[in-house]
Regions:
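A short, N-terminal "cap"/entry segment at the start of jelly-roll beta-barrel domains
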Residues: 20-61, 144-159
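Glycine- and acidic-residue-biased ligand/ion/polar-headgroup-sensing regions
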Residues: 68-71, 78-97
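Conserved short histidine dyad/triad with adjacent acidic residue
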Residues: 58-78, 112-114
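N-terminal post-signal-peptidase region of extra-cytosolic proteins
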Residues: 47-52, 63-71, 88
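Bacterial N-terminal signal peptides
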Residues: 6-15
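Short beta-strand His + acidic residue motifs that chelate non-heme Fe in jelly-roll/DSBH
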Residues: 73-75, 92-94, 111, 116-122
Length: 159
């Protein structure tokens, strides 16, 4: 009995902290004209992104990403989990060890922590939402899975 009471009292502050934290979160409703697209470090020049929610340098975030025709982010991984949902155009996603999948508007992809994958805009420009559950980063790899500098990975790609 005393154990249950102690446990309940120990968890009580968490309930209030969670509720208080949720109250601090403000809703967001906006059109794309309100966001500013810019180049992100270590990504191909053909990719721009706008922050929809959060701060990609410090924690979870949602980005709206645009890529030009044939634009490709070569084999890479991220330290956080990543979710992608196509808005427009066609994107080709290939997860290491899987067959490539062509995504159209509404298509979805999920890459768990450090899962190597590649993305290419096919047949024209494309746009997609990218959700990261931690600070956004990108680590490129060679054909053997060894990490390589962004400059090396992007040197032979469409910029």
């Amino acid at each position: 009995m005393y154990t249950r009471i102690a446990l309940a009292l120990g968890l009580l502050p968490l309930l209030f902290t969670t509720a208080r934290g949720q109250q601090d979160v403000k809703p967001i409703v906006q059109n794309t004209t309100a966001v500013k697209f810019q180049k992100l470090p270590n990504l191909p020049d053909c990719i721009t992104a706008a922050v929809e929610q959060g701060d990609p340098t410090n924690g979870p975030s949602v980005l709206m990403v645009k890529g030009g025709t044939g634009c490709s982010a070569p084999w890479h991984f991220h330290t956080p989990n990543e979710q992608l949902m196509m808005i427009s155009g066609t994107g080709r996603v290939e997860m290491k060890g899987e067959h490539p999948v062509t995504l159209r508007a509404g298509g979805f992809a999920y890459a768990p922590v450090k899962h190597v994958h590649e993305f290419t805009c096919m047949g024209g420009p494309c746009s997609f939402f990218l959700h990261s559950d931690g600070p956004f980063d990108i680590h490129y790899v060679d054909q053997n899975g060894n990490e390589i500098p962004a400059e090396q990975a992007l040197s032979k790609r469409h910029k």
